[in-house]
Amino acid sequence: MKLSVCLLLVTLALCCYQANAEFCPALVSELLDFFFISEPLFKLSLAKFDAPPEAVAAKLGVKRCTDQMSLQKRSLIAEVLVKILKKCSV
């Protein structure tokens, strides 16, 4: 539960910041990839951001945690995040 609240708050901060209410399509892709693709594929998708190895390792650590959630719970979280993104883009 704590992890989903953190993800929700981060998404709100990124999407609904006053200076830029437009969200980046890469954010949507990255969020959905985070919940639904395998760890090796996700690691490849993170390569496009050229993040430091420590950041990639941290993100993969969180992904390992969320991968332990049932697919149904991950789908519910993704659904809420998509709804938030839609509201932020209006």
Curated annotation (Swiss-Prot):
Compartments, record wording: Secreted
Stored Pfam families: Uteroglobin
Signal peptide residue numbers: 1-21
Tissue spec. comment: Highest expression was found in skeletal muscle. Expressed as well in thymus, trachea, kidney, steroid responsive tissues (prostate, testis, uterus, breast and ovary) and salivary gland.
UniProt keyword list: Secreted, Signal
Keyword Signal tagged: yes
Record GO cellular component, one term: extracellular space
Domain of life: Eukaryota
Family, as annotated: Belongs to the secretoglobin family. Lipophilin subfamily.
Protein purpose: May bind androgens and other steroids, may also bind estramustine, a chemotherapeutic agent used for prostate cancer. May be under transcriptional regulation of steroid hormones.
The protein, known as: Secretoglobin family 1D member 2
